[in-house]
Every structure is written in C-alpha cells, then in structure tokens.
C-alpha cells in the first residue's frame, strides 16, 4: 500500500513540510496514521482517495502541533530528479506561493494539480463538489495574483 501510493504521500508531505529536512518526518507520520487506520478502512472509496485523506489530515495535524512551538515556517523545494533548471525554478516559485495559502486551499490546489476530479476532491476534503469547484476557481485566481507580484 505504502509503496504503491508513495508518490501521493510525498507530494502531500512536500507541500506541508516547512523545510526539506522535515519531509521524511511528515512521511513517517502519514505512514503511521495509515498503518493505524487501515483496519478501519471500509473500502467505500478508492484506496488512493483514502490515502490522500489520511495524508492531508495527518500533515495538517502535524503542522498544527508544530505551530504551537515558535519557529519560522518556510517551504523548501528540492527536486533532485528534475534536470531542467528553469522548470525547477518555476516550480520552486509555484510551491513558494502555494505555501502561503491557507491549509484547506493548499490541500485543494494540491489535489487539483494532481488532476483529481471534483468528486474525489470533495470526498477527501469533506466539501461538496460545487464548493470545491468554486473554491478552486478562487484559489487559482489568488495564485495568479500572488505569482505575478
């Protein structure tokens, strides 16, 4: 399960971790949450949807716990597998802008970037599909403004 969905888990951790060094900590927290929650998985949704939901809520909880301690939160991007430096810089900028969004907005845009359908995003976040569509439109508009500054 973990090996099959590793990419999903790392992507969520990457967006929520305050720095490159913490991504593995977040990943371990998610794996532990998946291990604990697996006996309760009823199979009513796709496994990937369940993994996304657990990963998002675990990372958000981890961020909340860390926010209780005073520290600066900054998204550090490291894409060692990306050879194109210009694309890497653009991706760095995009993730830096995304990191300034609120928790729910980050979750929504991450799922949208993964090309997840609105129904699946709704199932993961607990929002209605209509609300997901409206929020994504507003988030994309906000990102354009933030990115062009």
Walk through the language-model features, giving the residues of each:
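Arg/Lys-rich amphipathic alpha helix in sigma70-family domain 2
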Residues: 40-42, 53-73, 87
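Short, charged helix-capping/linker segments at alpha-helix termini
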Residues: 10-29, 40, 124, 129, ...
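Short amphipathic alpha helix immediately N-terminal
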Residues: 2, 100-120, 149
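Pre-recognition alpha-helix immediately N-terminal to the DNA-recognition helix
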Residues: 8, 93-96, 103-107
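A short, charge-rich alpha-helical start-of-domain segment used by transcription regulators
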Residues: 1-11
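Acidic, proline/glycine-rich intrinsically disordered inter-domain spacer in sigma factors
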Residues: 75-99
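DNA-recognition helix of helix-turn-helix
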Residues: 56, 60, 119, 125-149
């Amino acid at each position: 399960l973990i090996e099959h969905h590793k990419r999903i888990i790392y992507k969520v951790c990457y967006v929520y971790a305050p720095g490159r060094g913490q991504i593995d900590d977040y990943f371990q927290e998610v794996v532990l949450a998946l291990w604990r929650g697996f006996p309760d998985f009823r199979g009513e949704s796709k496994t990937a949807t369940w993994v996304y939901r657990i990963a998002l809520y675990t990372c958000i909880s981890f961020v909340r716990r860390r926010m209780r301690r005073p520290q600066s939160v900054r998204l550090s991007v490291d894409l060692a597998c990306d050879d194109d430096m210009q694309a890497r810089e653009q991706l760095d900028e995009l993730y830096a802008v995304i990191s300034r969004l609120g928790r729910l907005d980050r979750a929504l845009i991450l799922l949208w970037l993964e090309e997840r359908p609105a129904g699946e995003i709704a199932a993961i976040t607990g929002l209605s599909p209509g609300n997901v569509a409206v929020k994504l439109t507003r988030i994309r508009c906000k990102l354009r403004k933030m990115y062009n500054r």
